[in-house]
Amino acid sequence: MTFAKPGDTAESLATRYLGDAGKGWMIEDYTGARTFEPGQEVVIPRRSWNPSGVEPGGYQIVPILCYHNLGPESKGRLLLAASKFEEQMRYLKANGYRVVSLSEFVEFTRLGRQLPHKAVVLTFDDGYKSFRQYAYPVLKELGFTATLFVYMDYVGAGRHALSWQDLRELSTEGFDVQAHSKTHGDLRRAPGETDAQYARRMQTELGQPQEMFRRNLGRPSPIVAYPYGSWDESLLSKLAE
C-alpha cells in the first residue's frame, strides 16, 4: 500500500512501483480508479491475483478482431475502409478497451498471465502493405499493438505486400509477426492423401516458414494461423511435432 502524490494516476504509480506504465491497468482494475487524490491510500498489486479469468459471476471473454486489407473504401469481406478501421480503434480506446498481444493471450489461456477486464486482441492476416500505410499510424498513436500473420509466398511479392524489411521494422516497434503457412493453402489432410504425401506437404507449409522466420527475423514462429481457419486432427498432430 502507498499514498498517492499530487497528480498520481494508475499509470504513474505503475511506473513507480511496478516498473512499467503499461501495468497501470492492474492498479485500475484492483482499485476501481484511474486517478487518485493526494494522500489517498492506494493498494499496489505486486502480482496477478486472478490469472484464470474465472470469477464468481462468470468468466472472462477476450474478443479477437481479425483484419485483412485496408484501403480508401470497403469492398467485399476482406477490404475495410481505413476510416472505418480508425473509427473502430478510437471506439476501443474511448471505451476503455486494452489491446494485448496474441502471445499474452496464449499465456492467459495457460493460466500464466492475468489480462485486463476489457482486453482485446487485434490480428492482421496475409501481410498486406496497407497495414503500414493505414493501420500502423493509428495503432501507434493510440498505443495499441497487433499480431500480423504472414504467408511466405506473399512476403515481398509486390508493391501491395509487406517485405521482410517491413516485418523486421514492425517487430522492433513492438508488433508481433507470426506464420500463416507458406502458400495459404488448406492445411487439412486431403481425401486420398497418403501419410507420406501429407508429411511432405506439411514440411513445406509448416517447416519452410520456420526456416524463413529464423533467417529473416532471427527467431521461429511459435504461433501459426490456419488459412481459412480450417483444421483437423492430422494438422494438429503435425503442428505438435
Predicted regions: what is each one?
Residues M1-F3, S12, R16-G57:
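Extracellular LysM carbohydrate-binding repeats and other cell-envelope/extracellular binding modules
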Residues T2-A4, L65-C66:
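A short beta-strand micro-motif
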Residues G7, L18, Y30-G32, R47-W49, ...:
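Solvent-exposed coil/turn segments that connect beta secondary-structure elements
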Residues Q60-K75, N95-R98, F108-L111, P116-V120, ...:
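Metal-dependent polysaccharide deacetylase catalytic core of the NodB/CE4 family, i.e.
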Residues A81-L102:
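Catalytic domains of carbohydrate-active enzymes, especially glycoside hydrolases
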Residues W231-E241:
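Short, electropositive alpha-helical surface patch
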